[in-house]
Design a protein with these regions (language model features):
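N-terminal capping/small domains of soluble enzymes
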Residues: 1-101, 107-108
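Conserved, mostly hydrophobic/aromatic
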Residues: 22, 46, 86, 103, ...
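Glycine-rich beta-to-alpha transition loops that act as phosphate-gripper elements at the mouths
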Residues: 27, 104-107, 170-176, 242-254
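Glycine-rich phosphate-binding active-site loops on the catalytic face of alpha/beta enzymes
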Residues: 48-53, 133-135, 191-201, 249-250, ...
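C-terminal helical cap(s) of enzyme catalytic domains, especially alpha/beta-barrels
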Residues: 59-69, 203-217, 260, 272-297
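Alpha-helix-loop-beta-strand connector modules within alpha/beta enzyme cores
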Residues: 73, 81-98, 146-168, 212-244, ...
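Glycine/Thr-rich beta-alpha phosphate-binding loop at enzyme active sites
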Residues: 133-149, 180-242
Length: 316
């Protein structure tokens, strides 16, 4: 029988029981909605909703548009209760459920991020902080993720105030992802989350206007997987020692394996949760089967192996 211990993976100094996490923004504020389906402790981790220093109401509705067969556009606008309310009302729930907790932090200016992180900097319940530098559906939401100097400055300031590991979540809407990655890592980021949603647009042919009130939104789902894989591939090839958290279009065990092979140390499941709330557990079980068939002593043996043409593996 395959041991769960062999599914352990390291993201820098962070050890996760398995490489499957719930992605921010796809599991409510603190994943309470998943309680009927599985125990949060079974996952590698839970990434919270993006949290800001003050509560946010989000964008006008409609906020979500389904793109049939391809995915969805969202323009939520980072609606959230604020970091103080989260710590008071939601963090105890995640602790009670023995979840591995990754707090996603967002802001519009540097002080927003600094103040939010300052509020949680000493919380030993938190495994890592994911800095959302790349939300495409709020004003200024891409600035930090598209400018290496701004990214460096922000991550540097955050590293000054907390010893909690920092993951920088980056945008695919850039010319060269490795420039932004280098800036974040040079500033002290302990890992990079690749990728956030792709900027997209949907048109209502009846109103002859964009479907979303803000016109554009963040595109997610199966269609963005090749973009995510390419950026993870480029990052791992140039910086093989930088821990990567893979995100983007993962809906199956095969998808997760491809991300690991490209260089990700773990992956986050996002849009697939809306289709099948049990998908994360199904992928974890699929990874066990894959490791058994390939006689792997550790899931970490897969990480980056697509860059080594001498190795082949058995299909699940």
């Amino acid at each position: 029988m395959y041991s769960m211990s062999e599914l352990k993976t390291n993201v820098g100094n962070v050890t996760l029981k398995n490489p499957i996490l719930l992605a921010s923004g796809t599991c409510g504020v603190a994943a309470r909605e998943f309680e009927p389906y599985f125990n949060l402790s079974e996952l590698g981790g839970v990434v919270t909703k993006s949290l800001s220093i003050k509560p946010r109401d989000g964008n006008p509705t409609p906020r979500v548009v389904e793109i049939p067969g391809c995915g969805m556009l969202n323009s939520i606008g980072l609606q959230n209760p604020g970091i103080e309310s989260f710590v008071k009302n939601e963090l105890p729930y995640l602790v009670e459920k023995n979840a591995t907790i990754i707090i996603n932090i967002v802001g519009e200016i540097m002080d927003d991020y600094v103040n939010a992180v300052d509020f949680i900097k000493a919380r030993n319940e938190i495994t890592a902080i994911e800095l959302n530098l790349s939300c495409p559906n709020v004003s200024g939401g891409l600035d930090f993720s598209q400018d290496p100097k701004k990214a460096f400055s922000l991550v540097s300031e955050i590293k000054k105030i907390t010893g909690i590991p920092i993951w920088a979540k980056l945008s695919p809407n850039v010319t060269n992802i490795t420039d932004i990655v280098k800036a974040c890592v040079d500033a002290g980021s302990d890992g990079v989350s690749l990728i956030n949603t792709v900027l997209g647009l949907a048109i209502n042919r009846w109103t002859k206007k964009p479907t979303l009130p803000r016109a554009t939104g963040g595109y997610s789902g199966p269609a963005i997987k090749p973009i995510a894989l390419r950026m993870i591939w480029e990052t791992h090839k140039k910086f093989p020692k930088i821990p990567i958290i893979g995100i983007g279009g993962i809906h199956t065990t095969d998808d997760a394996i491809e991300f690991l092979l490209c260089g990700a140390s773990c992956v986050q499941i996002g849009t697939a949760n809306f289709v099948n709330p049990k998908i994360s557990i199904e992928i974890i079980n699929g990874l066990k089967d894959y490791c058994e068939k390939n006689k792997l002593s550790s899931i970490s043996e897969l990480i980056g192996q697509a860059h080594d043409v001498s190795k082949t593996f058995v299909k699940v």
